[in-house]
Swiss-Prot record:
E3 ubiquitin ligase catalyzing the covalent attachment of ubiquitin moieties onto substrate proteins. This is E3 ubiquitin-protein ligase makorin. One of its GO terms (biological process) is protein polyubiquitination. Residues 129-158 are annotated as: Makorin-type Cys-His. Pathway: Protein modification; protein ubiquitination. PANTHER family: IP09428P-RELATED (PTHR11224:SF10), MAKORIN-RELATED (PTHR11224). Keywords: DNA-binding, Metal-binding, Repeat, Transferase, Ubl conjugation pathway, Zinc, Zinc-finger. Residues 62-92 are annotated as: Disordered. One of its GO terms (molecular function) is ubiquitin protein ligase activity.
Length: 323
């Protein structure tokens, strides 16, 4: 056994430095499984992290005896708390290194399914999640428990939706949409005003074809091929909905995603978007502020109110014919 710390990458079989590694590759050497990202409060894995979530020493009372520090970390939470209580009763002046149960990490093996150490495991075993069936809920971290529960329910809901969508066929090509050859074709094209299923490729080809001369675009291309109801846009989705509420949620998520993408026609204020206020994409100028939508209302001779698009001076001057 050497004095070096065991390489954490070697433990997981992923060290790329080999013999040139400055850490030890001897499994008998002491490991250092403390998560440095957690100490900086930037660990993104939470309870799923494979390393120990222990706060930095500056945030905790310092111990005068390094041996007691090692002993407190290596013992189980329940055993450590019991030792702490005994020390406090026997010697009021002793300086005990105290760690709140919230700081103990849960066992990654138990969280994944089964811990080979059982009751001898030095880590805390989490509570059972009723959704995923894993013991991954930390008993003393309510925020993590709530976050995991919501995320787990969301994943389970998505899996159930995928199962229900397996047998849905396209109303045009009559193929099962989720059984198509390429991943890009395995998407539904949802129409906002009807519930007929289409694959995204078929409905887009239908709406992009050239209209017959003299026929209205809305009645020929933007209408559903089956029921002829008019839908102004198509929503791509990897699952098929089972209720109007689920359909509305899919459409809202799609619109919210488009609102985060800059409109190529608006071009940060240098272009002109033909869709105007109806555009789903973000109309933002180069300095970051959003375009202020101002609708122009014009009254006709028949008493009707018409909303007109904004007219630029360059477009007006470009349309003049000077003889």
């Amino acid at each position: 056994m050497s004095d070096r710390i065991l390489c954490k990458f070697f433990v997981h079989g992923s060290c790329l430095k080999g013999e040139n590694c400055e850490f030890s590759h001897d499994s008998k050497d002491p490991p250092n499984n403390v998560c440095t990202f957690y100490q900086k409060r930037i660990c993104l894995y939470g309870s799923r992290c494979r390393y120990d979530h222990v706060r930095a020493a500056s945030n905790l009372p310092l111990s005068s005896d390094s041996e007691s520090l090692d002993r407190s970390i290596s013992t189980t939470p329940s055993r450590h708390l019991q030792q702490q209580g005994d020390n406090n009763d026997g010697d009021k002046s002793s300086n005990v290194y105290c760690i709140h149960p919230r700081e103990y990490p849960i066992c990654s093996f138990a969280a994944a399914g089964d811990c080979p150490r059982g009751n001898q495991c030095p880590h805390m075993h989490g509570d059972l999640c009723n959704t995923c069936g894993k013991k991954c809920l930390h008993p003393f971290r309510p925020e993590e428990r709530e976050e995991h529960t919501k995320e787990c329910e969301k994943k389970q809901k998505h899996i159930e939706a995928l199962k229900q969508s397996q047998d849905i066929e396209c109303s045009v090509c009559l193929d099962r949409i989720l059984s198509k050859a390429t991943p890009g074709e395995r998407k539904f094209g949802l129409l906002t005003e009807c519930d007929h299923p289409f694959c995204i490729q078929c409905i887009r080809n239908w709406r992009s074809s050239a209209p017959v001369s003299g026929m209205d675009v809305n009645s020929t291309l933007r209408a559903c091929p089956i029921c002829r109801k008019l839908s102004y846009f198509v929503v791509p989705s990897v699952v098929w909905y089972s209720s109007p509420e689920e359909k509305k949620e899919i459409i809202d998520i799609y619109k919210a995603k488009l609102r985060s993408i800059d409109c190529k026609h608006f071009n940060f204020g240098n272009g002109n978007c033909p869709f105007g206020a109806s555009c789903f994409y973000k109309h933002a100028y180069s300095d970051g502020h959003l375009e202020e939508v101002v609708l122009r209302h014009l009254g006709s001779q028949e008493g009707e109110t018409v909303i007109t698009d904004s007219i630029r001076l360059s477009e007006f001057l470009g349309g003049l014919q000077i003889f």
